[in-house]
UniProtKB/Swiss-Prot annotation:
The keyword tRNA processing does not apply. It is a multi-pass membrane protein. The chain crosses the membrane at residues 9-29, 45-65, 79-99, 149-169, 185-205, 223-243, 308-328, 356-376. It is found in: Cell inner membrane. Pfam families: SDF (PF00375). InterPro entries: C4_dicarb_transport, Na-dicarboxylate_symporter, Na-dicarboxylate_symporter_CS, Na:dicarbo_symporter_sf. Keywords: Cell inner membrane, Cell membrane, Membrane, Symport, Transmembrane, Transmembrane helix, Transport. Disulfide bonds: none annotated. One of its GO terms (biological process) is L-aspartate transmembrane transport. This is C4-dicarboxylate transport protein. It comes from Burkholderia vietnamiensis (strain G4 / LMG 22486) (Burkholderia cepacia (strain R1808)). The gene is dctA. One of its GO terms (molecular function) is fumarate transmembrane transporter activity. GO terms for cellular component: plasma membrane. Belongs to the dicarboxylate/amino acid:cation symporter (DAACS) (TC 2.A.23) family.
Amino acid sequence: MKKKPFYKVLYVQVIFAIIVGVILGHFYPALATDMKPLGDGFIKLIKMVIGPIIFCTVVTGIAGMEDMKKVGRVGGKALLYFEIVSTFALLLGLAATHLLRPGVGFNIDPATLDGKAVASYAAKAHGQSTVDFLMHIIPNTMVDAFAQGEILQILLIALLFGSVLAHLGERGKVVTDFIDGLTRVLFGIVHIVTKLAPIGAFGAMAFTIGKYGVGSLVPLLKLIGTFYLTSIVFVLVVLGTIARFTGFSIVRFVSYIKEELLIVLGTSSSEAALPQLMEKLEKAGCSRSVVGLVVPTGYSFNLDGTNIYMTMAVLFIAQATNIELTWMQQLTLLAVAMLTSKGASGVTGAGFITLAATLAVVPTIPLSGMVLILGIDRFMSECRALTNIVGNGVATVVVSAWEKELDRNKLRDALKGNRDVTPTETAGV
């Protein structure tokens, strides 16, 4: 097959767009902030098809299962994996902050901090308890779940729908075939929308640099550097070890999903690459049923980057305000963060709201301390989203391997670049 010219390759276009966005934001900030609708529009186009794709993928995957106990088994294994890896992420964030101490030397008096700037985040954080979160998974109506784009609600509907179709067997085949055909159409739409990724990445990056400025990074470069370094270590060491035991290279896996990662980098939203990630995981040999269950669930329950960020941010605020936390208080922080992180989604700003929820339950550290990192949170959001999407991709491959539903030949060929993986191919075929 004839190789594409480099300027027609999507990830090259996205890289170029990000660079142009940074330049525009730095030299022409007023004009750059007007580019925000380009990024927002691209994310909305992707979110437009996320719900239907999750529904169709999960329904056809479950409907094709001969053993309905498998649904619970896959879900149980996924949740077990999520909890174990999330704990590693939380502990790594805590350890890195203790080791590198990015907050030491600020010597800030908590009484001088103005919490008005973060009041809206605190209000959102207080607005939902664990019970509310669980009840929110049940939609008011099926239509409402799709209209609001609530991933967990759509997943619940799909689980019920697919289970009934599996029970009906041949009598439900007409519906299953229709949904399978609809899946092909939806991924075709994703292929069209993905071509607009460079425009979306340009708009989002130009707005970020134009609004916040590169200069806002300087005072807190140590915290940003610590977070990025810790996330890289997590991916290469923790996820890399898991990948090695599963039989694949984390470096090759990251290279395989580079286009999705660049879209996430440009938009700061891991949701922006969800449909493409699901399709690529199927192309790499993961079964449709596992992809359909693990990836959407992971967007609420397996946010590794957010977990690293939370323990690091809390400890940074404590160091900056000279507040000493006992080991018992830090263990409490880990337990609280494990719970509050489950309500985070893959959209920009969700990590900051989750941080507010964590601080609200740990009264030793003032909530107003969040103002210290408010200005740089947008720059840390990219790293959170990148780590989250890699973590969910690895989780899907691992659970597929546990279920013995991983085609290792496809995985090997995909990671080596021997398979022509294009969005126009039909998922699950």
